[in-house]
Each structure stands twice: as structure tokens, then as C-alpha cells.
Amino acid sequence: MERPALLQNGEHGAVGSLETKTTTRLMPKPFSIESLIATQTPATVSASASIAASPPSPPEDHEQEQEQELSARAMVASSALGLTQFPLYNPWLHGYFAQNHERLTHLIAGGGCYLGSPVGNPFAGKEPSHPHPPPPHALDKSPLPHPLDTRFLPFNASAAAAAASAATPTDLSYRRLAELMNQDYVHNLSVNARLQHMAVAGRLQEDHPSHSLMHLQEPMLLQANPFSPAKSVSHSPVEPTLDVGVDEDYECSGDSSSDISLTLSPMPRNCNRELDKSRNGAYTNSDSEDCSDDEGAHSHHDASGLGGKDSQGNGSGSSSSKSRRRRTAFTSEQLLELEREFHAKKYLSLTERSQIATSLKLSEVQVKIWFQNRRAKWKRVKAGLTSHGLGRNGSASGTKIVVPIPVHVNRFAVRSQHQQLEKMCLSGPKPDLRKKLSTEAMSGFEKFNGGGLGGSAPSSSTASVGAGSVGMGLALGIGVTTPLSLGRSIY
């Protein structure tokens, strides 16, 4: 595998042609570099044999055949030189030479016979004299064969760089050599060799602007390399040409890197948007449904003063979302209607809730949350009254429950509404409020008033509440027009 061995074997150029033909037939059939070179070597051998066996021809034909033979030998020499100077730091090449050392040695020893003749000697095939390899400029100035015949020859980056340094900008043969380098044999090389080849081809693009290399580089980068490992794709030194948006932690195989990267790169952004949309939609739809417990709305009521202003209820959705949702600003008419319905009935059915929401131009969720907050406040007030012992003392001041009114609500409208409620309760309330007061269902305050009446009218809903605990006679005389039914509905 060393170069001196190649040069010594190259001295027997014309003698070893038949041996080359027999040895190359023994090479295996799978797709590899040596099988491709073996398919090209018999063509050159047959060409040299035809030159030796052909009768004398005119000088022009003889010179043309000599030029063809010299060009073929030059390409074989460059191919063998490329085999000896592969970049051995590549992990694929290291394992490749370790497995196929004997086959490559046999191939180079048999097929390197064309290295012995210098390009300038016309009779080099018959009388080998100089065992030195041809210089790079001689390879450039010699006419090259058709690109289809030599497209599978391996690429040598160092030889191409030397040829690029020695060639002039107007050298047509160097352009043809670069075109040969861009053929589809480059798919057999590793990614590092491809990137070196692209660096050499970038110098050529300045000298040859009409021939664009973009259409040659795109299939070369997008097509898969079956021998290249995955790490050479994801960690190559000139990564921006191959990087199309794959994450750094994501590693893919060489045959699917381009397809997967093109389809997976916009995926995280789209997924994040969809997740945010679904998350916000879920919070919007399920915030109000989660707070079914009456006691769960206490914190919102404490923060707002009036729980009916907050329409969304639960704090888990608002804390998860980035921006806090606005509170629903109920109008005075809506608040009055809601208060009236609450005095009439503490718990609404689905039909009643939908009817109230339709009449007030609110959503059913807003009506449900308002009723939950209002019930929570009603329970707190009731618990506060019982803890202070107002029912046991029987003080009349405990019967008046002051509900804080929001600033934007008209206070006169609220007062008139309360007066209407009192009149309605005195004249005849709704059927829900017309309940017979039994001793078991009475609270302590109502039991006290019922005892004060002497049991004369225990079932009357229009009995007056005494201003103080002075006596039983004063309870009827100095009465305040607060019906028991309204007090019972507030409690």
C-alpha cells in the first residue's frame, strides 16, 4: 500500500496487462471503490492491447491514439494516487482499510502498472524509463477522457489542491477535471471529503462563472451516504451547509438527515402555539366550571368586595395564564335583577339559570359564578351573626344586613329596589317564600319573636319585629316593618 511499491509495480506496464485482466475479474460484485476501478481497468487494458496489435496507421491517427492512451494512464495514475492518500482520520476509512487490506493491496499491485511511464514519453508503455509519478501540471494539460468513463474514480483532495495551485484561470483541461470531480462518484465519499471538495470547487467558481455548482452540490448534500456514520453528519466542521434546523440533541442517520430535518424543524414552534391555544381555550372553558364549591370563592370575594363582579371565579386558570382576565362589570340593572333572584331562590336550576342569563344578556357561567359568590357571602354573614349571639340576645339591630354596593351602581335605584322587595314581601311574596313557619324550622331569632307573640299567630308572615326586648306588649306597638320572610331569606 506504500507509494514505492506502487512505483516498482508500475515499471511492468505493458507486460502485466493480461494479469491485470485476470485479477480484476476475481474482485467481488458488491458496490465498492475497488469494484468500480476494476470495471474501468479492463477498458484501458483493451485499449493498450489494441494499440499494440493494430497495424501501422497514419501519423495523425497514431498521435491521437497516443494522446488517448496517455490520458487514460494519467487518470489511472491519479486514481491510484488517490487511493494511497485517503484521509485516514476518517472513521469510515479506518475501518474500511482494516477490513479490506488484502484486497486493496492486491488491486493496487495489479492495477498500478500504469504509474511507471511519464506522460511526456510517447513510448512509455513499451520502454519504461522513469519510475516517478507524473507532476500535477502534466495531468492538467493532458486531454481528459469523457466524463462518463471516469466518473467513478475516487477523489483526492490534496491532488486537486495541488492542481488548483498549478493551473491557470484559462485552463480548459482543469475545468474539465473539476467537472469530473463533481460527478456522482462523490456520493461514495465521506462528508469530510465532500466538504474539502466543495472548498476546492469554490475556487473554481471564480474562474468559471458560467458553470454553476449549486445544482451539483444540492443533490450531493441531500442524497444519502450509506457508508458515512451519523456523527459525521451532525458534527462536521462546515456544519451550516448541512444544518437545516435539526435540534442539537437530536441525532439522525445519514440516509434520513435531510428529510427529517426539513420536516421536524418548524415542528416545536407550531406545537408550542397549538399547545398555548388549547391551554388558553381549556382555561377559558373550564375555569368557571371548576369552582362548583361555594366555599372556593371566598378569596375572590375578599379581594373584590363584591363577589358578583368577578365572573371567572377560580384562581388556578388566571395564575396559569400570562395575563389576568378582566372582571365582568355588571350594570345596575343586572345587579338588581340578580339580587332579586337571589332573595327569591338561593340555588338555581339549569333552566332558571339559562332564563336569567338570556334576560340579562349574560352567559350562564357568569350567572353561576355570581350566585356562588353571593352564597359564599351569605354564609359568612350568617355565620358571623350566629357567632356574635345576636339570635340569643334578640337585638333588632342584627336583623338589618348591610350589603356593600359597588361605586358604579346607583344607590337610589338600590334603595327603591329594596323598598319594592319589602312591599312585595308584605303584600304577597313568591310561592317559594310562602312557607309555614314550624317550630323545628325556626331559627333562634324567629323562635324568640314567636314566643313574644304569645303563640297567637305563629304562622303569620307579617308579624313585626320588636325594636328591643322591653316587653311583649311593646313588640307589637313599636314594630319595624321588616318581615320575617325577608329576614329568613337573607339568613
Swiss-Prot record:
The keyword Nucleus applies. Pfam families: Homeodomain. It comes from the Eukaryota. Residues 254-264 have a biased composition (Polar residues). Residues 305-316 have a biased composition (Gly residues). Residues 323-382 bind DNA. PROSITE patterns: HOMEOBOX_1, HOMEOBOX_2. Keywords: DNA-binding, Homeobox, Nucleus, Transcription, Transcription regulation. One of its GO terms (biological process) is regulation of DNA-templated transcription. SMART domains: HOX (SM00389). It is found in: Nucleus. GO terms for molecular function: DNA-binding transcription factor activity; DNA-binding transcription factor activity, RNA polymerase II-specific; RNA polymerase II transcription regulatory region sequence-specific DNA binding. InterPro entries: GBX-1/2, HD, HD_metazoa, Homeobox_CS, Homeodomain-like_sf. Plays a regulatory role in neural branching of the tracheae: segment-specific aspects of these neural branching patterns appear to be generated by homeotic regulation of expression. This is Homeobox protein unplugged.
